[in-house]
Regions:
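N-terminal ligand-binding/catalytic initiation module
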Residues: 1-110, 118, 125-128, 301-304, ...
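Adenosine-phosphate binding glycine-rich loop
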Residues: 10-15, 229-340
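Short helix-loop-beta connector
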Residues: 125-131, 153, 216-217
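Glycine-rich Rossmann-fold phosphate-binding loop(s) that bind the pyrophosphate
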Residues: 137-138
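NAD(P)-binding Rossmann-fold cofactor-contacting core
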Residues: 151-175
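Short acidic low-complexity segments
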Residues: 179-194, 209-210
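Short glycine-/small-residue-rich Rossmann-like dinucleotide-binding loops
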Residues: 201-203, 225-226
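Rossmann-fold NAD(P) dinucleotide-binding segment
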Residues: 204-220, 234-236
Length: 340
């Protein structure tokens, strides 16, 4: 069984290349969204606890693999020097149930979120989109810029965060990327003139991070911060103006921007699930005046894609630690022999 630690993952990314990994991950996501109906999936179960939420994200392809991810969201963790989001995941065979890989998924979650947003943006944003407004410059912000840079010729990033130190960090990390960086005093200033608006905030509340009056015709919005009940980022009146795409309606209705609508309203408003854009049955955009919205909550299929890709690369480069999470015994009915 492969064990992918942070150190192992860094070696894989250094060996393969960060941008190439994101490109291949986008292709893996396309492949897996393209066979959407073959997966057994469910909205993730969650437990709301003091300070945050704990979630499990299982999925099965009904052919080869089953994966799950454990993930949290504790917005106040940075105050004690800890990550807002941490995650681990497992890839298992479905024919025997045996695990093949156990992996860190804090970094993998950021990578798959970036690749998934880039995929949706490629299908929904105007081709001439060059200016990105980024609201929230926390742990996922740099990954988002790197992903979007693959699918659009981003020339300028206008960014804002309520934490000035987070903006300092973002500017330092992005200084050499070859894109004009514009530090803004508030979200309205950042959004002004943007072609793409990406929100990646952590506040566990219904907050109008983006106001309706700021949103102009032709803009594409990636609303990525909504990932649990009671956590949204857009003024509700924005939604009826948009062509709204979600990943998985059953989960988005619980956790996404559309959670504030009743079921009938949400069904009427949502134009498509992302797989329908991937397979070409629906178009992400039909003209340059449309406002498009990717109401993303993050789903288990994305974790499946990133775990499968990482497993293949770990085998290819013989990286990752080998370990036993199951007993190695000659008689499978003699479990106690492992202890004798």
């Amino acid at each position: 069984m492969k064990i992918i630690t942070i150190e192992s993952l860094i070696k894989i990314l250094n060996k393969y290349g960060f941008d190439q990994y994101l490109l291949d991950l986008m292709q893996a996501l396309k492949r897996d969204y393209g066979r959407w109906q073959s997966f057994t999936k469910m909205p993730r179960p969650s437990m709301h606890v003091p300070g945050g939420v704990l979630e499990l994200m299982p999925i099965c392809d009904n052919a080869t693999y089953y994966t799950f991810k454990y993930v949290n969201c504790h917005p106040k963790n940075p105050l004690i020097g800890q990550q807002t989001v941490v995650a681990t995941g497992q890839l298992s065979r479905i024919d025997t149930g045996y695990p093949l890989m156990f992996s860190e998924m804090t970094i993998l979650t950021a990578l798959r979120t970036a690749a998934n947003a880039a995929l949706a943006t490629d299908l929904m944003a105007r081709k001439d989109s060059h200016i990105l407004a980024l609201i929230g410059t926390g742990a996922q912000s740099e990954f988002q810029v790197k992903g979007l840079k693959i699918v659009r010729d981003i020339k300028e990033v206008r960014y804002f965060d309520i934490d000035s130190k987070a903006m300092d960090k973002f500017e330092k990390n992005m200084r050499s990327i070859g894109i004009k960086l514009v530090r803004c005093h508030d979200a309205e200033e950042a959004v002004n003139g943007a072609d793409i608006i990406t929100t990646v905030t952590a506040c566990k509340a219904n907050v109008d991070v983006i106001k309706n009056k700021w949103v102009k015709a032709g803009v594409h919005i990636n609303a990525l911060g909504g990932d649990t009940v009671g956590k949204t980022e857009l003024e509700l009146s924005i939604l009826p103006r948009c062509r709204v795409v979600v990943e998985y309606f059953d989960q988005s209705f619980i956790e996404g921007e559309i959670q504030r609508l009743n079921h009938e309203e949400a069904k009427k408003l949502v134009y498509a699930e992302l797989y329908e854009l991937v397979n070409g049955s629906k178009k992400g955009r039909t003209n340059d005046q449309e406002i498009t919205l990717f109401d993303s909550v993050g789903i288990a299929l994305e974790d499946y894609s990133v775990l499968c890709l990482t497993y293949e690369l770990a085998k290819k480069y013989n990286l990752g630690e080998d370990g036993n999470f199951t007993p190695l015994i000659s008689d499978p009915k003699n479990l106690i022999s492992a202890l004798l």
